[in-house]
Curated annotation (Swiss-Prot):
GO terms for molecular function: mannitol-1-phosphate 5-dehydrogenase activity. This is Mannitol-1-phosphate 5-dehydrogenase. Belongs to the mannitol dehydrogenase family. Catalyzes the NAD(H)-dependent interconversion of D-fructose 6-phosphate and D-mannitol 1-phosphate in the mannitol metabolic pathway. The keyword NAD applies. InterPro entries: 6-PGluconate_DH-like_C_sf, 6PGD_dom2, Mannitol_1_phos_5_DH, Mannitol_DH, Mannitol_DH_C, Mannitol_DH_N, NAD(P)-bd_dom_sf. One of its GO terms (cellular component) is cytosol. Monomer.
């Protein structure tokens, strides 16, 4: 039997990032999704292209050796695939993990204890996403008496992924355009008694937290800050936003604040972090990505939440008595991202802002309590935005 990976979420990250490396590593990829249209396309198209764009030009890979299953209508088939697979990966969005957990749990439960445990790796933009998935699988969907030897059937490894996938050409079909740069870091510790799965592109580490926080508080903070400042100043793309010296200065300032936190907390060298920041600003300002500010800014409620790219680092800096002004400025711009066409959360944000006091907004949206040192500062920002409306 050849190697097989089951991947949930046949969107751009799934097809363009995860499946590309699985394919290059010799895996047959079985895509699972609930979108009829994408499943039908994959079932009737024997190959698609992954196009990497960088400052130095474009390259492409052809992806073959995959199948596709509608997990809504063919659950039994998905369970059978997981029962005989080597790896399960997913890129469905952090809020969807609970919905894919039941079918994965059934697949794992049907596995032999004598086979190598299946490796489960969630590839989501969230800290500890595989843990979240594992908790749903083990906590909600695995019989109590099957938990003791569950580790003989499955191992769960958290991961940090970093690759910018812009909005795609509507006529591209299954082809995916993304940036050349990537980072895929996965926790090695669950595989202490056997080799982790051989997947090209993965960097295996014993401590993932520095990588996750560095990525979230640099790439995600910088990307979103550029988008929200850009949207407020009526720029079309992140590239356009970063051509404005004032916006560029704001993004740099926010990343100087998060860099102070990252260097102090994780012992990363200051110069190494500075080089990382410079590389990130070049990446998010890649003119070939044509990334609309509305797309990068979408889901402002999630992006303003407690563990996310602005409030999490600002809260830690406030606790340490350090400067967080630029992060607060970026958060202000996120609060102004309201009633944006095609983005439900921006409409919900507008409703919350109009129906609540500033204090209630900060508790509700940012998850901050009134005794936190950051709380009054965010309240002041919300009051300012509310006054302008």
């Amino acid at each position: 039997m050849g190697l097989k990976a089951v991947h949930f979420g046949a969107g751009n990250i799934g097809r363009g990032f995860v499946a590309e490396f699985l394919h290059k590593s010799g895996y047959e990829v079985v895509f699972c999704d609930v979108m009829d249209s994408i499943i039908q396309k994959l079932q009737t198209t024997p190959s698609y292209k992954v196009i990497q764009v960088g400052a130095e030009g474009t390259s492409e890979d052809t992806i073959t050796n995959y199948r596709a299953i509608n997990s809504k209508t063919h659950e039994a088939d998905v369970i059978e695939e997981i029962r005989t697979a080597d790896v399960v990966t997913c890129s469905v969005g952090p809020n969807i993990l609970k919905f894919i957990a039941p079918v994965i749990a059934k697949g794992i439960d049907g596995r032999s204890n004598d086979a190598t445990p299946i490796a489960v790796i969630a590839c989501e933009n969230a800290i500890g996403a595989t843990d979240t998935l594992a908790n749903h699988i083990k906590g909600d969907h695995t019989p109590q008496e099957r938990l003791d030897d569950h580790h003989q059937r499955a191992r769960y490894a958290n991961s940090a992924i970093d690759r910018i996938v812009p909005a795609q050409d509507p006529d591209a079909g299954l082809d995916v355009k993304l940036e050349k740069f990537y980072e895929w870091v996965v926790d090695r510790t669950p595989f202490s008694d056997h080799e982790p799965p051989a997947i090209q592109g993965i960097k295996w580490v014993d401590d993932l937290i520095p990588y996750i926080e560095r990525k979230l508080f640099t790439v995600n903070t910088g990307h979103a800050a550029a988008a929200y400042h850009g949207y407020y100043h009526q720029k079309a793309t992140v590239y356009d936003a970063l051509q404005d010296p004032n916006i560029l200065k704001e993004v740099h300032a926010a990343l100087e604040e998060t860099s102070r936190l990252i260097v102090g907390k994780h012992g990363i060298e200051a110069q190494e972090q500075k080089d990382y920041v410079d590389k990130i600003i070049t990446r998010i300002g890649n003119p070939h990505l044509e990334d609309a500010v509305e797309r990068v800014g979408r889901a402002p409620l999630r992006k303003l939440s407690r563990k996310e790219r602005f409030i999490a680092p600002a809260a830690e800096l406030a606790e340490e008595g350090k400067d967080f002004t630029a992060l607060l400025d970026a958060a202000e711009m996120a609060f102004r991202f309201q009633n944006v066409e095609g983005d439900e959360e921006s409409k919900e944000l507008a409703k919350i802002m109009s129906e609540n006091s500033a204090e209630q907004v900060v508790e509700k949206v940012c998850g901050l309590q009134s005794d936190h040192p950051l709380f009054p500062h965010v309240v002041a920002v919300v009051k300012k935005v509310q006054a302008d409306e």
